[in-house]
From Swiss-Prot:
Belongs to the neurotoxin 32 family. Residues 1-19 form the signal peptide. It comes from Chilobrachys guangxiensis (Chinese earth tiger tarantula). Residues 97-134 are annotated as: Disordered. Disulfide bonds join C24-C35, C29-C53, C63-C84. The keyword Signal applies. Keywords: Disulfide bond, Knottin, Secreted, Signal, Toxin. This is U34-theraphotoxin-Cg1a. GO terms for cellular component: extracellular region. The keyword Signal applies. Residues 99-134 have a biased composition (Low complexity). It comes from the Eukaryota.
Length: 134
């Protein structure tokens, strides 16, 4: 019975791997929508690496950081416009890219001499108007 289950599992894994993308080992996945995923199947006295084309991760999918060789273990990198960031407990997911111009940490501290309150602005306007009216 165990042998039959192992045989069935092996057959399913090979069929899935070949039907996904036969040329992934040669890095011929369509890089605009796919990445190359390489997984290792281990059975008693047998080990095999299976390559397949996986879909690029979209928002909130698990992801891996882009690398130089284009081969990934479990998850593909994010589609353009998203970035792979740590979410919880070491999990990384695709989230919108953070714009560096919108962060307030890049701005310098505000000094008291540069702060103008609403009442000061109103008083200054009234003084200017009265001076022009003379």
């Amino acid at each position: 019975m165990k042998l039959a289950v192992v045989f069935l599992l092996t057959t399913v894994v090979f069929t899935l791997a070949q039907s996904q993308c036969e040329n992934c080992a040669d890095l011929q996945c369509n890089s605009t929508v796919h990445c190359c995923l390489v997984s290792t199947v281990r059975l008693p006295r047998w080990k095999r690496e299976i390559s397949r084309c996986g879909r690029l991760a979209i928002r909130r999918w698990r992801c891996e950081e882009p690398n130089s060789n284009g081969i990934y273990n479990r998850n593909c990198p994010c589609v353009p416009g998203l970035e792979c960031r740590e979410f919880r407990r070491g999990r990384r997911i695709c989230l919108p890219e953070q714009s560096s111009t919108s962060t307030s940490s890049t701005q310098g501290p505000i000094t008291s001499s540069t702060v103008t309150t609403q009442s000061e602005a109103t008083t200054e306007t009234e003084t200017t108007t009265a001076a022009e009216g003379k």
